[in-house]
């Protein structure tokens, strides 16, 4: 029908499907890499006691205060020297670095809301720390992890400045 003619032209003549696939790969890759790093970091900041914990906790969001345009020239220079311009790997690095602070911040708030008594019950039941994280904390955190995953996907999908520069 005439109604969908423009869509057929865009996908057929302008290779739009390939661009959509690339955007999907980059966005999903960013989500996966960000969650791999954000979950242990947020758990550490929320639960473990270490020197500089408060400073680290507050500085996570301070990083997010810098506008992206300030980072473009230094990153462009570094990525040119490393040969990461015009590559999916380069975008994954930049997108992960820009979404990691907000992912850690969101997850640490949720991890703090989980009662410590559940972890203590896991220790009594014979679980080690990895067992506690994988069998108690992560299943209880699935709503927060899904929210963070959707938010990171949205940020990566809508980001244009870095994809234009790199």
Predicted features by range, described:
Residues 1-166:
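A structural signal for multi-pass alpha-helical bundles of membrane permease subunits
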